[in-house]
Amino acid sequence: MEQEQDTPWTQSTEHINIQKKGSGQQTRRLGRPNLTQLMDHYLRIMSQVDMHKQTVSWKQWLSLKNPTQGSLKTRALKQWKLFNKQGWTD
């Protein structure tokens, strides 16, 4: 019998039942994740993605050399429009 390979996805989303065999060995049976587990996993992943986007955005801001008030305003408006457009399409 072929054993299933655990991936980060199955480890974090699938409910694992551990049972003991007669020989004392433990077997793992992967069950279907419930809605709460899936939502929890989704929110964790999206939070990580959002933090990464924020970090990248701040690095871009900090990399600007001698920004003027006008260039910062223009850049902020572009970022805001892009963010709003992505927010509605996701």
UniProtKB/Swiss-Prot annotation:
Positions of the UniProt region annotated as Mitochondrial targeting sequence: 65-87
CC terms in the record's Gene Ontology section: host cell cytosol; host cell mitochondrial inner membrane; host cell nucleus; membrane
Cleaved signal peptide residues: none
Primary location class: host cell
Swiss-Prot/TrEMBL GO biological process terms: symbiont-mediated perturbation of host apoptosis; symbiont-mediated suppression of host cytoplasmic pattern recognition receptor signaling pathway via inhibition of MAVS activity
Keyword Membrane belongs to the record: yes
Record key words, sorted: Apoptosis, Host cytoplasm, Host membrane, Host mitochondrion, Host mitochondrion inner membrane, Host nucleus, Host-virus interaction, Inhibition of host innate immune response by virus, Inhibition of host MAVS by virus, Inhibition of host RLR pathway by virus, Membrane, Modulation of host cell apoptosis by virus, Viral immunoevasion
Region described as Disordered: 1-30
Keyword Membrane listed: yes
Subcellular location: Host mitochondrion inner membrane; Host nucleus; Host cytoplasm, Host cytosol
Residue ranges with Polar residues bias: 1-28
Annotated site residue numbers, Low pathogenicity: N66
Record function comment: Plays an important role in promoting lung pathology in both primary viral infection and secondary bacterial infection. Promotes alteration of mitochondrial morphology, dissipation of mitochondrial membrane potential, and cell death. Alternatively, inhibits the production of interferon in the infected cell at the level of host mitochondrial antiviral signaling MAVS. Its level of expression differs greatly depending on which cell type is infected, in a manner that is independent of the levels of expression of other viral proteins. Monocytic cells are more affected than epithelial cells.
Matching HAMAP family: INFV_PB1F2
The protein's assembly and partners: Oligomer. Interacts with human SLC25A6/ANT3 and VDAC1. Interacts with host MAVS.
Further comment: Is not encoded in all strains, and seems to be dispensable for replication.
Name recorded for this polypeptide: Protein PB1-F2
Organism per entry: Influenza A virus (strain A/Memphis/1/1971 H3N2)
Higher taxonomy: Viruses, Riboviria, Orthornavirae, Negarnaviricota, Polyploviricotina
Gene this chain is encoded by: PB1
